[in-house]
Amino acid sequence: MVHLRTRSRAKIPSNLTQLALGYQQVLDANPYQTEALVGMSLVALASRQSEAAVAMAKAAVAASPQIGITWITLGQVLKAEGRIGEAESAYERALFINGMDGLAQLGLGELRLSMGLPEAALVHYRRALRRQPTMASAHLGIGHSLASMNRHAEALAHYRQAHELAPHMAECDFCMGFVLARLGHMDDAIAHYRSAIARRSDFAAAWMNLGVLLREQGRLHHAEAALARAVTLRPKDVDGWLNLALLLREQRRQPEAEHVLRKAFALEPENAHVLMACCQLCMARNDLPGAWEWLRWSQARAPLNAEVVNLHGILLHHERRLAEAAEMFLRAEELGSVSAASNRGNSLLDMGRLEESLHAHELAVLRNPQSAGTRYNLALTQLRLGDWANGWENYESRWRFREVHPSPLHFRCPRWRGEPLEGRRILLYAEQGLGDAIQFCRYAAMVAARGGHVILQVHPPVERLMHSLGVVRSGMACVTQLGEEPPAFDLECPLMSLPAIFGTTVETVPWPGPYLAAAADPVAHSLPQASAHAALRVGIAWAGNPKYKADKFRSMRLHTLTPLFRISGVQWFSLQKGVAAAQLSGLPEDVYLHDGAGKDRDLADTAALIAALDLVITTDTSIAHLAGAMGKPVWIMLPHLSDWRWMQDRPTTPWYPTATLFRQSTPGNWSHVMERIAARLTTPASAQCLLPKQKF
């Protein structure tokens, strides 16, 4: 939540007590001294003593009803008390005294804007500007009115004029930061927030908005410091605590987030945003009963709040009540939620209604073009449907989407965009999982062909494997591990941005033949000899990284595969690593599965094992990518709604010519997949074609 907040235009010195004493001395000598009464009223207003402020302003009016500033002051303090009608009358009286009074027009503009009437406010602000062309506050007011109507570019022009007229006014920088963020110029917005803070170090709203933008950029340490400063300066501001809680929750610091939310709840227990944040915190720790309870509290207090309705849809989606979720998201859209269309697109996607999902995501981007998450969801749908030209471009939004990159890497050198390298050194680095590194390292040779030297930085488990890449063996690239300091480089590019740079389409996926290979290694020779009755040696993997949020859909329990292990003529080898490998001990006594990966040090060892097999059968894991990259026949078992890279309703994939895809016919139904694989394994023709080594 980033906020545009303004403070009173009155310039009140910081030492209010001393100022009040000075005015009081004047009033002791002359209780009807107008200037002192006006000054005391403004001091009381700045000190949040509203009753005293009104009393002093009325005394000033009584002393000098013919002087416009007394009525303007009365209007200002009445507006601060929420007495809108009386404030309007006071400003109108000031104009009756002097129709050319710019301050009275300014006051009416502020009044109209506070009433939610920005167009009416513009009329008064412009009149004020005509009376006093150098009035910075009038430009600020015009900017506020335009910003409230989402006319941010026009608002920025007026904020800049205000800044030229009053370069030391912190509010000008603050307001420029606000609209620049809305226009997508995040770095410029951050710079202006910092300037506002430099001019006024206690500017709590600037600290808060700075923290929000830094969080969106993944600069979490600096964001936390800014938000902590904001809540220190303004401890009763619920929005500051909410933003800090959101940051902590995204860092999975749940106990701290809960502690901060308690502070927000203590301040405003009826605040729907606080209640929704409590609901989201329960969802993050998978406490669905608690989440539903907080949602009900939110609904009781704000039943027509668009984000409350949107959150209801999120909970329904989380429980896989997809049709209900899509309907709830549609209601949230009608109420004005900017994120609900993207959420509806996700529900439609999970129901297999791809074209409707695409339309919803396109609509979401139109409504909220600056949202990284919205554009990222559109990208995944486009890639899934084969629209790679647009999909790769939109996929770049992942760097601004914290769910994908909570702490993105920052380099001092430029990002490579595909230009000739001319002998420069370029860092290509893995950014997501092991399988992604294996899938996209094929592009390293294409980058080197642009005339530079490639430094390939990958996860430790695949570092040794990458030495088998032809571009590394030729000396045109070297390999280093993530977390290590790489050799000096001139340019950088993440591996998963390379398909966009090279304009990859479904028809032009680079496949130079198998591009990863096993080194000569004792592992390959340690496999048991093929049994007399076994014609096929098959490797199996059934589970991925359990930390991946969609792992419950792509992974299975080992016992699900038991029917395959009873097929005669097949010798089975486990390629499974991680916690799921412990399931080997629970196999029935009549089933035997060699633990081929138990002693693997890394994926180079796994590659040596795969090289000795005839076939690999796996769920969507790094093993699928490794076998495919080696040119080994691989059967990939996929959930009903698989990852975008396997596209939709295809038995094959352009990424790996030797891969066959076995997709669930209905969500969660692995039994049909087992039946199809068993049929293929027991068909003599199918089994026989696996035995010869593949040639490319």
Label the predicted regions.
Residues 1-615, 620-696:
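Alpha-helical solenoid repeat scaffolds of the TPR/TPR-like class and their adjacent stem/linker regions
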